[in-house]
Amino acid sequence: MDQREILQQLLKEAQKKKLNSEEFASEFLKLKRQSTKYKADKIYPTTVAQRPKNIKKNRYKDILPYDHSLVELSLLTSDEDSSYINASFIKGVYGPKAYIATQGPLSTTLLDFWRMIWEYRILVIVMACMEFEMGKKKCERYWAEPGETQLQFGPFSISCEAEKKKSDYKIRTLKAKFNNETRIIYQFHYKNWPDHDVPSSIDPILQLIWDMRCYQEDDCVPICIHCSAGCGRTGVICAVDYTWMLLKDGIIPKNFSVFNLIQEMRTQRPSLVQTQEQYELVYSAVLELFKRHMDVISDNHLGREIQAQCSIPEQSLTVEADSCPLDLPKNAMRDVKTTNQHSKQGAEAESTGGSSLGLRTSTMNAEEELVLHSAKSSPSFNCLELNCGCNNKAVITRNGQARASPVVGEPLQKYQSLDFGSMLFGSCPSALPINTADRYHNSKGPVKRTKSTPFELIQQRKTNDLAVGDGFSCLESQLHEHYSLRELQVQRVAHVSSEELNYSLPGACDASCVPRHSPGALRVHLYTSLAEDPYFSSSPPNSADSKMSFDLPEKQDGATSPGALLPASSTTSFFYSNPHDSLVMNTLTSFSPPLNQETAVEAPSRRTDDEIPPPLPERTPESFIVVEEAGEPSPRVTESLPLVVTFGASPECSGTSEMKSHDSVGFTPSKNVKLRSPKSDRHQDGSPPPPLPERTLESFFLADEDCIQAQAVQTSSTSYPETTENSTSSKQTLRTPGKSFTRSKSLKIFRNMKKSVCNSSSPSKPTERVQPKNSSSFLNFGFGNRFSKPKGPRNPPSAWNM
C-alpha cells in the first residue's frame, strides 16, 4: 500500500472513532492501567530520581523520570553540581534522543536547566505553559524579556535579542553566553494552553510545530519541550510532531496507531498525554494532519499527471528552412528573446488548427498509416495537443518535458483539456520514453515540423449553381451508366501517390516541395473523419459514429464484402469512373484539411478507438453533387497510376506498387455514407475475404411492383439479352434470405428516382419507353405521391375488388 491508501484507511478509522467517544475513554483507560502497572511492578525503575538528594529537584512526587531514559548532566560548573535533572529522552523517528521532555525549572534547578541546554547544544525550546497558572507558580523564568538586562544563572548569561509575537505564542531569540562562547537559542512560548485542558483550536498548535521545524528541520540535536510537569502538554507536542515527521517523509506505516504511539512514549516518561481530553486532542491534530497531507498528495499527484501528460520526448530541435534551433533551460527564467521565439512558434501552432479545430495527436490503427517520403529525415519532436485557450502556454524544454509556463505579463491559466495522456498511458504518472525506431504500442509518433504549418485548410469550394434536383439527376445518370455494365470491379488501392492525393483535393499545395522517393521517410498517419449526412440522419455530425465508411453487408462467415476494402483517404469518397482509365478521386466531402506537401509532418502512428474526431462543419446539398464531363463514357476501371503512399504492413499491402483487385463489389443503402476500414486490415495476419457473386444493375435498388412490371416490358424489347438474365437473377436475389437489403431513412428521398431509373428504357431505343402511371419527378414530395400505394402483398387477392 502506498501512503495515499494508508492515509485514507487511517482517516476512515479515526473518523469512526471520533463519532464514538466511548472508544477514546476505553483506550485512555488502558493507557492509565498500563502506567499503573509499570509503577506497581517497577518495570521501569526510577531509582535515581528517588534518591534523597534528588527528591527536592522534582516538582511533583509522582512524575519521576525512568532510569533508562534519564538525561544525565556531565557539564559541571561547581562542586555542588550533580548529574540529575528531571528530564527524559523521547525517541523520535530517526533517533532515540529526538526530544527532551522536562519539567518547568524550579528556582533550585535553573542552573541545571541551562547546563542541560548547553551540554546537549539545544537550539529550540518549546514552553507549553505560563509562568503562573491558577495563582500557582508553574515555571521559573529562565529567559530574559526584550530590553531587560541580561540574566545571570551561574556562569551563564542570558539575554533576549528579539521577540516575535504570534496569535497564541511568542518566538524569542535568546543569546546565551558561557566561557566566552555565545550561542543563539529560540524559545517558542505557547501562552493559551490551560493546564489539564486543551486549547480551543488545534491550528495554533500545528502552526507552532510548523514554525518549530522551520528553525530545526532534523533531529541532529534534541528539541527541548516542557510544560509544568513535563508530561501532559509536553506529550501532546511530542506525539503530534512525531506524526508530522512521518508524514513529511512519507513513511507512515500500515499499522500506525495513536494509541500505540502514546503507549510507547509512556514507556520513556510517565504520564505523557496526561488526560483523556489531551488524548482526544492528539487524535484531532493527527486527523487534521492527515487531511492536509492528503490534499498535498492529491496536488502533487495531479501535478505529476499534468507533467507526464505534457512530457514531450525530443531527440533534437533542429528546425529546417529558416528557423533556428531552440535551447531552453529547464529551471531558469527565459529571457525576452527566447520568450519571443516561443510566442512566435506558439502563434504558428495555434494558426494551424483554425479558430475551432485543434491539432490532436493520438494513436491510430496500423491499417490507417500512410508513409510519405521526404527529401531529408531531420530530427523530430512531438507536438503537444493544442486546444483553444491554452495552446499558447506550452513551453518545450530540452529534457523532453513541457512545463506550463505563462508568458511574461499574462496571468496564469488552467489547462482545460490535457487528457490525451490518459488516453495514451492510462493512469500512469510518468510518460514512457518514446523511441522513434521501435515505438511502444500506444506511444505517440514523432512530428516533424518545418517552416510552414503542419496542416492547411483547403480553399473554399466553389459554389455550385446546380439545384438539388439537378444534383440528384446527375447522380442518377452516373449510377445508371455504371450499372449498365455487366459487373463492377473495384480494385483495392494499396498505394496512393501523394501527388494524386493532392490532385484529388482542390487547392492542393505544390508537389515539388516533397520529393517522392527520398531515403528519409516522413510518416503521416491519416484517419477518416467524415460527418454523417445532416439531412438524412438524426445523429449529430460530431458524434462518435462520424467516421466515413460504407455499411456493406457481411457474408455469413463474417467476412466483409470486397466493396469495404476501399482505401482510407482523408475525408474523400471515390467514384471509380475515369474516361482515361485512371483512378480519379472525386471528393464528396472535404471538411478536413488535405496534406500540405510543403510541410513535413509526422502525426501519431496509432489512434485509440474511444477518441472522438474534432467537430466538422455541416454539409450542404451541393456537396452531394458530383460534376463530370457530359457525354463521356464510364468504362470499367482496369488499371491505375503508379502510387507512392503505402498503407501499414498487412497481407494485402506488402509495400509494393502492385494493386490487389476483387471481382465484384456490393453496395447496400445505409443510413450514412461511411468508409469503414476492412476487417482484413484489422487482422494483419488474416487472408482477404473471398469475392461475392456477381451483382447486377437492378440488384442495387429496392424493387416494387411497378418497377418489376416495367422492367418486364422493357427487357422483352431490349437488345441486351444478358440484362434480362440479370433482371431474373436480381429478383431471385431479392427473395434470397441471406441477401436481403435493409431500408434506410436517408434513402427514402430516392424512391421516385429509383422508379424512374427502373422504368427508363434502354439508350438504344428511346422511343419504346414504358412509363408507369405513378411515375413522376422525384422532386415532387407531395403527400399523395409518397403514400399513393397501400402497403400489402405484391399480388392482392381477388376478394379485395381493386
From Swiss-Prot:
Substrate binds at residues 227-233, 274. The modification Phosphoserine is found at residues 35, 452, 634, 680, 687. Its EC number is 3.1.3.48. The active site is at residue 227. Keywords: Autophagy, Cytoplasm, Hydrolase, Immunity, Lipid metabolism, Phosphoprotein, Protein phosphatase. It comes from the Eukaryota. Its main location: cytoplasm. Gene3D superfamilies: Protein tyrosine phosphatase superfamily. It catalyses: O-phospho-L-tyrosyl-[protein] + H2O = L-tyrosyl-[protein] + phosphate; N-(5Z,8Z,11Z,14Z-eicosatetraenoyl)-ethanolamine phosphate + H2O = N-(5Z,8Z,11Z,14Z-eicosatetraenoyl)-ethanolamine + phosphate. One of its GO terms (molecular function) is protein tyrosine phosphatase activity. Residues 613-621 are annotated as: Interaction with CSK. Residues 24-289 form the Tyrosine-protein phosphatase domain. It is found in: Cytoplasm. GO terms for cellular component: cytoplasm; cytoplasmic side of plasma membrane; nucleus; perinuclear region of cytoplasm. Pfam families: Y_phosphatase (PF00102). Residues 745-754 have a biased composition (Basic residues). Phosphorylation on Ser-35 by PKC/PRKCD abrogates its ability to dephosphorylate and inactivate the SRC family kinases. PANTHER family: TYROSINE PHOSPHATSE N18, PUTATIVE-RELATED, TYROSINE-PROTEIN PHOSPHATASE NON-RECEPTOR TYPE 22. Belongs to the protein-tyrosine phosphatase family. Non-receptor class 4 subfamily. This is Tyrosine-protein phosphatase non-receptor type 22. It comes from Mus musculus (Mouse).
